[in-house]
UniProtKB/Swiss-Prot annotation:
Name listed for the protein in its UniProt record: Protein-export protein SecB
Organism of provenance: Buchnera aphidicola subsp. Acyrthosiphon pisum (strain APS)
Subunit field text: Homotetramer, a dimer of dimers. One homotetramer interacts with 1 SecA dimer.
Transport recorded as keyword: yes
GO CC annotation, single: cytoplasm
Molecular function in Gene Ontology: unfolded protein binding
Signal peptide: none
């Protein structure tokens, strides 16, 4: 019975934290008087690092760039990180866990932080849509 428990797949969130965050609005206050027809660019990236046996850091990097014509309205980026305990998972499932499941856990935290920063910058509320990290992962491995 004890041997079965040792072999059982295990996943635990140990910590979720902001590793880095930045908000820049270089064209304020003049940009507040411009007709609000922005273009929004969203970039995502994920990095992983094995800290020690069965302990992994996953960092979801989210960068939002908003422009009106050629003028930068604001740039907001966050490195939302988590430390995860993952044991007894084969290599294929481990990669899926690190590059899909963990970013899915981290994204709502990053989205909330970005929304708060944008609001504090006195810009219209920004609600990023949910991201299908499973689809992104499967596209990446093809």
């Amino acid at each position: 019975m004890l041997e079965e428990k040792k072999k059982q797949e295990s996943f635990e969130i140990q910590r979720i934290y902001i590793k880095d965050v930045s908000f820049e609005a270089p064209n304020t206050p003049n940009i507040f008087h411009v007709n609000w027809i922005p273009t929004i660019k969203l970039n995502l990236n994920t990095t992983t690092k094995k800290i020690k046996e069965n302990i992994f850091e996953v960092v979801l990097m989210v960068k939002v760039t908003v422009k009106i014509k050629e003028d930068l309205v604001f740039l907001c980026d966050i490195d939302q990180a988590g430390i995860f305990f993952i044991a007894n998972i084969n290599e294929k499932r481990l990669k899926h866990c690190l590059y899909s499941y963990c970013p899915n856990i981290l994204f709502p935290y990053a989205r909330t932080c970005i929304s708060n920063l944008v609001s504090c910058g006195s810009f219209p509320q920004m609600n990023l849509a949910p991201i299908n990290f499973d689809a992104l992962y499967h596209d990446h491995i093809k």
